[in-house]
């Protein structure tokens, strides 16, 4: 069993590799620390790579009943973890929902963050054209839940992107998935606040990123004063460039 640290009221299972500057890897919806293991392994050659299961996923705890969360609550978990591990300031790499958590750390816990990789950030408040895609996605998930239960809803959201053991882990964590999904739009941030975030950052998408996610990434990169865009989808490479920069 991996060691755990206390988050904001829940125990979080943590996996560490390597030594050097701290890198915190924050997974997205329907994922876990195991999914980030290849990235952590790559980064551990030159850094202290820290991955953890967010609340409700993998070996981490969650309140009972676990029916909802917010970006800010998740960021409090991450902040508590960084303090408990004496790992700040850290390069924070967040994917999907994890990118919003990284942004909130930059906004409210600036001293804990040295730089950030924001991969596929679902910051759709600045992308009006995303409304149609998000509505269709919600309808598909709801139909899947009616037909096959909550695990089928997770499967529908993943849309074949994940298979095998990773898919089974995601479906087993369906409570955390739906808590996350409900919290996607929970982050209160204005253009003015984002323009004030001076954290060196890479806003990352890949060739496979959906158009509305790419649009969100473009909008975010234009607002963050110290951000640059990358479109190769290589989170480890983006993180390594920031490590080398420091």
Model-based region annotation:
Residues 72-90:
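Conserved acidic catalytic loop of the alpha/beta-hydrolase fold
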Residues 88-127:
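Conserved hydrolase catalytic core segment
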Residues 189-198, 220-221:
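Serine-hydrolase catalytic core
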Residues 197, 203-205:
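Short beta-strand/loop motif that positions the catalytic acidic residue
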Residues 210-216:
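Conserved alpha/beta-hydrolase "acid-adjacent" motif
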